[in-house]
């Protein structure tokens, strides 16, 4: 069984609750419980998360649920991957860290960065194909990625294009409105293509000392057996990130930022 920290499922459950939509049928259908998703130290199977998002979209009668969740979610919910990016010096190095440490959040995905003269492409491939296309998950992930880059660079720019491996025949105009770039469906791979100039942008909150601490923790997570990682990483990670946030706030207060 492949494991995920289930940030997408937790954020989707929170979204349904805020909108007054009954999440229990989707939870039951995915083999999940509210108590599981209320605890950050419990991971779930990747297949269960995919299934929950698809069932939640059906319950909400919202074919764009993943995008709607991503538009409102706390970007930090993804955990250590967000903070690895936030403390990196440039977008290029932030994406390298995302690719290197992606399995700390989701064992089912392989992330790669391909660099060309005028553009760079981040691709995501699945270790194994799910029973049904995880459309909501990957659309949520796409908007999370774009919003995170905007926040961490304090710049608003559009990807050159985004591709999804799943098909979509409806609400295409709305998808483009959210992602603000050409989007192609039913492609060989899920990918985000950025101009090379974006790769060179600085991360406004770059912090080399904190990055070293975070990468050491992430390296430790990668070295653990998946079962151990599932049980323990969630317990250590929230405290580390809480300490990180408090330390950064104190630093800004003292330095007058």
Residue ranges and their predicted role:
Residues 17, 28, 58, 151-153, ...:
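Short polybasic/polar patches that bind polyanions
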Residues 79-85, 127-131, 199-200, 219:
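Short hinge/gating elements
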Residues 110, 114-201, 205:
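DNA-contacting interfaces and partner/effector-binding or oligomerization modules
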Residues 1-122:
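N-terminal low-complexity or simple alpha-helical regulatory segments
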Residues 177-257:
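Extended mid-to-C-terminal alpha-helical interaction segments
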Residues 10, 92, 135-143, 208, ...:
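Short, well-ordered alpha-helical segments
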Residues 53, 142-145, 218:
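Hydrophobic alpha-helical core bundles mediating ligand binding, dimerization, or RNAP-core interactions
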Residues 1-8, 14, 127-128, 134, ...:
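Surface-exposed, interaction-prone regions with an acidic/low-complexity signature
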